[in-house]
């Protein structure tokens, strides 16, 4: 997407439309707080996450069908067809909030802000703010989330907007029908991105500065079970957070596949100290990686363990890994995840599946021409066949994943061939020193460190970190 197109869109949108667009993308660019639409779209463009279809969806969400036709040469029906056939950039939860905001007049919003003072504090938000501003503040206090809409529903009932209360109830029913409960705004978006390889990495690139980090923590941390003294208001007492069971000995298998050769000892020591049985493989080909992953996905030993960890270090493309191969062929990252989904790997259903991937991205000009590997060989078929024999899994197939991907330019290996990845160094240090803290919290701080590093180095030396997760409980990465 060109800068010229982004400029045209930004110039054509009015203030309310810009606000709606920024709100709609809070799940997509959760690691940053863009001050304006131009910066938001530019960030997505730089990350390769602003396709024509993505921009068309955003214009559709703000109902600028004229811009669809004038700038993108698409009509409304074409976008609706695209949305029916493809995962959405904007989560259903964000769409719902935007629709409710459009249906509220100023007096309704003023009444809602007044009612929310019992929960937010008197000076938290001014009467001049919009409904979407109110939702953002409620998210920061963990009072509103994709699976936490009871308070908003109650307040809509109190202002006699039963029509909007009913709309929330219909949304809840649709989420329950999907069979998965998402705990925060990040996870609501992941449900979409997990289903389409072209949208694998819409989330979490690096970490913002400390001020921005604190601004985001409200929608990422667990509900607070104490009063907010700054506002002299009390939040409803929350049910204690449920944790994943992490008591088996060992905690599980930690599979290390290091196709570079710099990380094995560091990673082995780290995960052994956490209580994992470490199994390592060095310098595998693309097909070798696929075969090993397929074998480990089928291991019956998983039924006796409480979790699984996979650390993969390789050269690769933006959405695939090559192993030691030197062609355009690649093992798609979404195929790796698919091997361990609940229906393919039932012994790990309901248990956390933790992936840390360091991918050194190779430009296309450095490789021989070939096609992307489709994983339909013996390893993948074996996984699917065994899953069919065991029957359906009761836990949603995409649940319980923690997927951390770090990409860096392959030239880093040429400059410091024997040096380990900064991402994996920091990760190992945090896991060993702060093992009793939630993994999500550790990763947020890891992102902050990587952001600071990136601000001091050249483009070729930067590390870009993405996090996707569908965790349903708090995850402490050691014995609990």
UniProtKB/Swiss-Prot annotation:
**Region (Interaction with TRAF1 and TRAF2) spans which residues?**
192-480
- Region annotation (Caspase) ranges: 263-358
PTM note = Proteolytically processed by CASP8 generating subunit p43 and p12.
Region labeled Interaction with CASP3 — which residues? 192-435
Ranges for region Interaction with CASP8: 1-195, 370-480
Question: Which Pfam families does the entry mention?
Answer: DED, Peptidase_C14
Q: Where is this region: Interaction with CASP8 propeptide?
A: 1-305
- Give positions of region: Interaction with FADD: 1-227
**UniProt entry keywords in alphabetical sequence:** Apoptosis, Repeat
Annotated segments matching region Interaction with CASP8 subunits p18 and p10? 217-480
Q: Where is this region: Not proteolytically processed and involved in apoptosis inhibition?
A: 1-435
Q: Name one GO biological process term.
A: regulation of apoptotic process
Residues annotated as domain DED: 1-73, 92-170
Has keyword Ribonucleoprotein? no
Site (Cleavage) residue list: 369-370, 376-377
Report quaternary structure and partners: TNFRSF6 stimulation triggers recruitment to the death-inducing signaling complex (DISC) formed by TNFRSF6, FADD and CASP8. A proteolytic fragment (p43) stays associated with the DISC. Interacts with RIPK1.
Q: Domain comment, in the record's words?
A: The caspase domain lacks the active site residues involved in catalysis.
Q: Which PANTHER family match?
A: CASP8 AND FADD LIKE APOPTOSIS REGULATOR, DED DOMAIN-CONTAINING PROTEIN
Q: What is this protein called?
A: CASP8 and FADD-like apoptosis regulator
